[in-house]
Each structure stands twice: as structure tokens, then as C-alpha cells.
């Protein structure tokens, strides 16, 4: 039996108003990128249920690593949302995402799964976006970004960043930790950023 691990996006949920959500949360994609991922998830799920393969879908939040931090954005002085307008985000270190994908493949090959299983490939962080930028700035001795109200920020950031600023959710990773245990490199983004700063990005 063939096995497939598909890396989707947590963007398939759209805006959840900062709520903590599980894998059973209804999908409400709000941009073309997320719509494409929903279409791909559904197409793969149909094929898996027809018996073509066993499938794990990993819904992935913001990926970061030693070489994937918002340092250029901080140097450019790109603003973040004011605290009262800020959005909740989730994160995963690239090395931990790779470990999760490998754990998923191993479990699929043991045939202990239903034909389709979904996981939030997220660490334990519960952090707002602006606080994440502040965290990185502090770790690397940089100036924190200015904070602007939601109505002011649209003209100052890219459309891609603005789309992230319009969605707020917290991913519950209970199922992941119970069924796909890994040796974490960074259980939360604060630990991962501190390690990156210690090594020098």
C-alpha cells in the first residue's frame, strides 16, 4: 500500500477570531493560496478513500529556522499590528516539521491508521504576530517594529503579510503529540529563536 504525507497550511481555516482549534474545525479559506490547499486536501482525501493510498495531512503554520527569520523585515522597519489589533499565530521549526513528516511516514507504513488522518504540525507556542517580531528583534539586538492600528497598516506592508494579519487562530497540537511523538528541537518559538540567536543567524 502506498502512503502519502501532504503538507498543507493552517490557512485552510481562515480567520478563527483567535480561538484555539482542533483538526475538526470547519475550513473557511480566505485567499487563493489557502483555497488551492483545500482543493488539494479534498482531492487527495477522495483518492485515499478509494484505496489508492493511505494519507496523512499535516496542516502547517509559520515555518521558521536559523535561516528563515524576519530579520530583513525588522531591518526595513516594517510595522506590526498594535497589541489591541494583533492576531494569534502558530509556529513550527523547520527541523521539527521534517521530524513530524518522517514520523508520519513511519506510522503510515505500520498500517495502524485510518485511510486519512489530519494533524496540526505546530509547536506549543501561543504568541501574537507582533510579539513574535518583538521576540526576534530582542534576541538579535534589533529595534522592535513600530505598531500601527489595523486601518493604518494596509499601506505599509505587502499584500502577503497583510493577508496573514487578517487571520487569527491558535492550533491545538494535542493529537500530534499523542500520536506522532518526536524529539523536539524547539518546543516553542521562544526556544527556537533563542537558539538561533546564540548560533548567530
Regions found by a protein language model. Give the residues of each.
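Substrate-positioning beta->alpha
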Residues: 63-73, 82-106
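NAD(P)-cofactor binding segment of oxidoreductase domains
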Residues: 1-7
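Catalytic helix-loop patch of NAD(P)-dependent Rossmann-fold dehydrogenases
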Residues: 17-57, 82
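Mid/C-terminal beta-alpha module of Rossmann-like enzyme folds, strongest
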Residues: 98-100, 104-161
Amino acid at each position: 500500500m502506498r502512503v502519502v504525507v501532504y503538507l498543507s497550511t493552517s490557512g485552510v481555516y481562515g480567520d478563527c477570531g483567535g480561538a484555539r482549534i482542533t483538526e475538526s474545525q470547519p475550513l473557511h479559506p480566505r485567499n487563493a493560496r489557502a483555497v488551492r490547499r483545500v482543493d488539494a486536501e479534498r482531492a487527495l482525501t477522495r483518492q485515499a478513500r478509494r484505496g489508492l493510498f493511505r494519507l496523512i495531512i499535516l496542516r502547517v503554520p509559520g515555518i521558521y529556522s536559523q535561516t528563515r527569520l524576519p530579520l530583513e523585515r525588522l531591518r526595513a522597519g516594517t510595522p506590526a499590528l498594535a497589541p489591541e489589533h494583533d492576531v494569534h499565530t502558530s509556529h513550527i521549526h523547520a527541523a521539527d516539521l521534517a521530524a513530524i513528516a518522517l514520523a508520519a511516514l513511519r506510522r503510515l507504513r505500520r498500517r495502524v491508521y485510518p485511510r486519512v488522518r489530519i494533524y496540526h504540525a505546530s509547536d506549543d507556542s501561543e504568541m501574537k504576530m507582533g510579539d513574535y517580531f518583538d521576540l526576534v528583534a530582542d534576541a538579535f539586538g534589533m529595534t522592535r517594529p513600530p505598531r500601527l492600528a489595523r486601518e493604518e497598516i494596509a499601506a505599509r506592508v505587502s499584500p502577503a503579510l497583510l493577508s496573514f494579519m487578517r487571520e487569527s487562530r491558535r492550533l491545538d497540537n494535542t493529537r500530534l503529540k499523542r500520536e506522532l511523538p518526536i524529539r523536539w528541537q524547539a518546543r516553542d518559538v521562544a526556544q527556537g529563536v533563542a537558539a538561533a540567536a546564540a548560533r548567530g543567524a
